[in-house]
From Swiss-Prot:
UniProt protein name: tRNA dimethylallyltransferase
List of residues binding ATP: G17, P18, T19, A20, S21, G22, K23, T24
GO MF annotation, one: tRNA dimethylallyltransferase activity
Subunit structure: Monomer.
Domain of life where this protein originates: Bacteria
Keyword vocabulary terms for this entry: ATP-binding, Magnesium, Nucleotide-binding, Transferase, tRNA processing
EC number in record: 2.5.1.75
Site (Interaction with substrate tRNA): T108, R130
Region Interaction with substrate tRNA, annotated ranges: 42-45, 166-170, 247-252
Catalytic reaction equation(s): adenosine(37) in tRNA + dimethylallyl diphosphate = N(6)-dimethylallyladenosine(37) in tRNA + diphosphate
Keyword Nucleotide-binding attached: yes
Organism in which the protein naturally occurs: Yersinia enterocolitica serotype O:8 / biotype 1B (strain NCTC 13174 / 8081)
Length: 313
């Protein structure tokens, strides 16, 4: 996952980082100083009506620095890494054609990887195969299907939890359609990104400080009306916790509260813990990322200058 060295290719900037690390603020500041246009790389910000719980850039922030690929799906709709790559490449081409630089900002590391390294040649979803798998699950339980996957593809089974029906179903579906395991197919990469990419990761030096920010921001979301926002989605009646939108951090815990499974205090506790776990996963991705320049989110001025210096060189 190295920077693309071909200087004949147009430039692009990646601003990556864990949740609550200051990515949005840095990107908006860069928009004031460089000829950049922002493209969101966030699997939660794509959904309309999910603003507070996703920490979506405010109307004022988007007026200062419009973000592309925000509010492009209803929460009932699906959106894959392949969908993102196709949409992002189009936005990047449009930005480059206008003589500006695409700045991709977010924390969905799978999307960044798909964009940078291309996608493995996985088969498209097959509703009939998926239905057959779900019928098996209803009869035998997901634990039995997980054991089946362990025989077919032990590497994937070790990565996928038995209580993760979406990923479990997909791993089985890939094998039933293609005759090849998910592990085999994901080793084959697709097209790389035709840009000279400057990659940055922003995070606090202290993990404790990041945890404090996460807790503070979750309480700020609640004060801003997160429960009301989630209840509006809950009351629609067509959304449930098997959908990617409702599995987003914060919304899943709010759903448990609204359905009476847990009380308010437990929802807050679980929401903060889940957000911390998300940040930990994001940091794990980034530490193994390769060619990336780290920025200290506690020194925003220095971070801004560092990006400008590298991009302008």
């Amino acid at each position: 996952m190295n920077d693309i060295e071909n200087l004949d290719q147009p430039p692009a900037i990646f601003i990556m980082g864990p949740t609550a690390s200051g990515k949005t603020a840095l990107s908006i500041a860069l928009r004031q100083r460089l000829p950049v246009e922002l493209v969101s790389v966030d699997s939660a910000l794509i959904y309309r009506g999910m603003d507070i719980g996703t920490a979506k850039p405010s109307a004022e922030e988007q007026a200062l620095a419009p973000h592309r690929l925000i509010d492009i799906r209803d929460p009932a709709e699906s959106y894959s890494a392949a969908d993102f790559r196709k949409d992002a490449l189009k936005e990047m081409a449009d930005i480059t054609a206008a003589g500006r630089i695409p700045l991709l900002v977010g924390g969905t590391m799978l999307y960044f990887k798909a964009l940078l390294d291309g996608l493995s040649p996985l088969p498209s979803a097959d509703p009939q195969v998926r239905q057959r798998i779900e019928q098996q699950a209803a009869e035998l339980g997901w634990e039995a299907l997980h054991q089946q996957l362990a025989e077919i593809d032990p590497v994937a089974a070790a990565r996928i939890h038995p209580n993760d029906p979406q990923r479990l179903s997909r791993a089985l579906e890939v094998f039933f359609i293609s005759g090849k395991t998910l592990t085999e197919l994901t080793k084959i990469s697709g097209e790389t990104l035709p840009y000279q990419v400057h990659q940055f990761a922003i995070a606090p030096v202290s993990r404790e400080l990041l945890h404090q920010r996460i807790e503070l921001r979750f309480h700020q979301m609640l004060d801003a009306g997160f429960e009301t926002e989630a209840r509006a989605l809950f009351d629609r009646g067509d959304l449930h916790t098997d959908m990617p939108a409702i599995r987003c951090v914060g919304y899943r815990q709010m759903w448990s509260y609204l359905s009476g499974e847990i009380d308010y205090d437990e929802m807050v506790y679980r929401g903060i813990c889940a957000t911390r776990q998300l940040a930990k996963r994001q940091m794990t991705w980034l530490r193994g990322w390769g060619s990336v320049q780290w920025l200290d989110s506690d020194k925003p001025g220095e971070a801004l200058d560092s990006v400008i210096q590298v991009v302008s060189a």
